[in-house]
Amino acid sequence: MEIINSRYKMTDTVLGKGGFSEVFLGTDMYTDNKVAIKKINITGKNSSDIKFLNKLDFEIRTMQILNHPNIVAYYDVMKTENYWYIVMEYCNFGTLNDVIKFNKNKGISSLDLEKNTHYYLNQLRDALNYIINMGYIHRDIKPMNILLTKSISENNENNENTNYDRSNSLILKLADFGLTKKCSENEEDIMNTICGSPLYMAPELFFNQHYNSQSDIWSFGIIMYQLLFHDHPINATNYSQLKNGLKNQKINFPKNNMFSNYCFDLLSKTLAKDPKNRLNWSELFHHYWFIHWSEQHCPKNKSDDSNNKKIPDKSQFNEILSSTKSPLISLRQFGQLGQSNLSKFKNNGAINCSIDFPKYTNNFPSAVNQSIKIGLSGSSSPINIPVRNNSSKKINYDDIELISNGNIFPETLYGSISPVDSIINKETRNKTNNPSSLNLSEFVLSDYEI
């Protein structure tokens, strides 16, 4: 038992583990609600590893910015000499991996299985639509990073014999933003680091090709396949078999299931090995299976309506403009929030704003200090908010962040230049001399530059 910041009681119950962190069950003593507390070890080499600390800081700032019913909520962060503690929403109903096992063992009809799959993927689609519009790519989408919950009161109850059928109205929550990266609205924005979980990584990452945000669409397709067929589309038990299968094995769809043509169409187009033939995000979000098939077969229930109408407890704009502890936010994200989200929140105390700055669409001036004008509704004159870039040359405005409390935290890339085979060898060197013995279901690659 550990008391953190005189508010959170952290138990010894471990909810999950990572390379340098553990997630414990805790309680917010102010509200008596259960929370999840991620305890991150920053001792030893981590304490002086600027890239590690920048990555951790970026993960926290990303969680502070993202606010959506289908994303695990961020509550608080505390820092001590040896540990950082991130307090998050507690999800007590397992992960999407439990749904896959449930579908496999229940033996339900094809139609009910498709409805169940649709119920969860529709929520994942909403979460991904949100983070893409916010200018992020997740890069580690997998069932273990997709949590399930209900209301706070139900979350504080025992969840024995959980029914993962859609009738139980579980809410999906996308989690773990440790590998998340800012990306451009342009889907051709090229990534130059290898990361993710091999079983869910797109083929282009295995063969030293640059990739873009469509790699997450492949991960979406793998999850859809697993929900429907209870297995991975590539028959592999180790890394070498997986890579060979991605190169040479045709993805087959079992024919003994009577799923709709729209379901198969979406599945096959998300699992196109060539990213040029894969769906783009707009095509995924507006696919017939989500828009029209659901109207015929999946009428909305009460949880769907309440989930869609949920409004964040506070305006991110009010937090950014008024609080000295507000998170940094990139200029692009600030603009996207203003354009796409504020109209939904204006009855919740949010400000209505517009951004006025010169048309530096491709480049922002190289001067160290700049400011942008934010026009506030109900105000006769705009206010100026300082921005700063950390480059002596002209840079894309994605790299410019609003200044909060005088602090600048530039996002950095990190890792070693190495093809994926060498990375696998490096990561497994201390465990085994044979990378083929790698446990694919538990292994995660961090950022490695290509």
Swiss-Prot record:
The keyword Kinase applies. Its EC number is 2.7.11.1. Residues 9-290 form the Protein kinase domain. It comes from the Viruses. ATP binds at L15, G16, K17, G18, G19, F20, S21, E22, V23, K38. Belongs to the protein kinase superfamily. Ser/Thr protein kinase family. This is Putative serine/threonine-protein kinase R517/R518. It comes from Acanthamoeba polyphaga mimivirus.
